[in-house]
Amino acid sequence: MDYKSAGVDVEAGYEFVARIRGAVERTRRPEQLGGLGGFGGLFALPAGYREPVLVAGTDGVGTKLKLAFALDRHDTIGIDCVAMCVNDVLAQGAEPLFFLDYLATGKLSPAQLAGVVEGIAAGCLEAGCTLLGGETAEMPGFYAAGEYDVAGFCVGIVERSQIIDGNRVQVGDALLGLSSSGVHSNGFSLVRRIVELAGLDWHHRPEDFPASLGEVLLTPTRIYVKPVRAALEAGFDIRGIAHITGGGLIENVPRALGGLGACLERNSWPVPPVFTWLERTGGVGRQDMDQTFNLGLGLVLACPTEQADALQAYLAKQGEQVLRIGAVVEAAGVRFA
């Protein structure tokens, strides 16, 4: 009897590490100390901060993983994992510094999980943070064949005086919406149920879709770090940032407004076809759509109304599609006009 016969293949682990080494190294920032393989990752705080505050976030990808398994496509899931974490850290105004991942599977497939980590590295590059370390657990009998779980953890930094917590948001402030890339990483339990009850598979291509249902739904979550951080460094007064994740617009927008509320104009932004298809095919009510999906908006910013046009133009030059979607109001919660 040995470890391999018990279901843990150490040699496969070595192969996996060899496959990911180059992708991980490409994410390296100057503040990183040491390299791959240490017991802990070392990272020096960047210079220039008077009162640095660390901001931490952790998240996973949820049942979007089931779609990756069904299509045997694993190169985008890692980007999703990074995006879910770094966008949350960004919502406090922070610059993401480093990221760590946790991967668990029943039987380690070096090629499959290397694809996941390569996606994580791509997401880290897009967010400007280091992939500082990670854990890969091979757990025989714990997961179905070919399946795995992934979670991430991100740490960022922000000057104490520049923390964005919604407390400076004022009634009348403009709300700007940054377009999402699609469903992102929330609501997939409902998505999967809709597709199942409709008797469809992931290769089905609805009439108004640019690709198959599976390809559209696997589009990775958009990472907003660089354009929004650039706007902050350019001096724009962004007073609140809402990352539109689980809970949709209904639950997430108020989290960024310091106890105030939002009036959103429904016709002010285009809702991507994937959402109208899900609503129609699944017979999903408007309230459920509003509190489950991002409906085409991945990030919502609150800023003084006199800066709204300039901020919108600035972010557009950074490659974002930005729309003025409403205003901050006195009454808490979200209402639609």
Curated annotation (Swiss-Prot):
It is found in: Cytoplasm. Keywords: ATP-binding, Cytoplasm, Ligase, Nucleotide-binding, Purine biosynthesis. It catalyses: 2-formamido-N(1)-(5-O-phospho-beta-D-ribosyl)acetamidine + ATP = 5-amino-1-(5-phospho-beta-D-ribosyl)imidazole + ADP + phosphate + H(+). Pathway: Purine metabolism; IMP biosynthesis via de novo pathway; 5-amino-1-(5-phospho-D-ribosyl)imidazole from N(2)-formyl-N(1)-(5-phospho-D-ribosyl)glycinamide: step 2/2. PANTHER family: TRIFUNCTIONAL PURINE BIOSYNTHETIC PROTEIN ADENOSINE-3 (PTHR10520:SF12), TRIFUNCTIONAL PURINE BIOSYNTHETIC PROTEIN ADENOSINE-3-RELATED (PTHR10520). One of its GO terms (cellular component) is cytosol. Its EC number is 6.3.3.1. It comes from Gloeobacter violaceus (strain ATCC 29082 / PCC 7421). Belongs to the AIR synthase family. The gene is purM. This is Phosphoribosylformylglycinamidine cyclo-ligase. One of its GO terms (molecular function) is phosphoribosylformylglycinamidine cyclo-ligase activity. GO terms for biological process: 'de novo' IMP biosynthetic process; adenine biosynthetic process; purine nucleotide biosynthetic process.
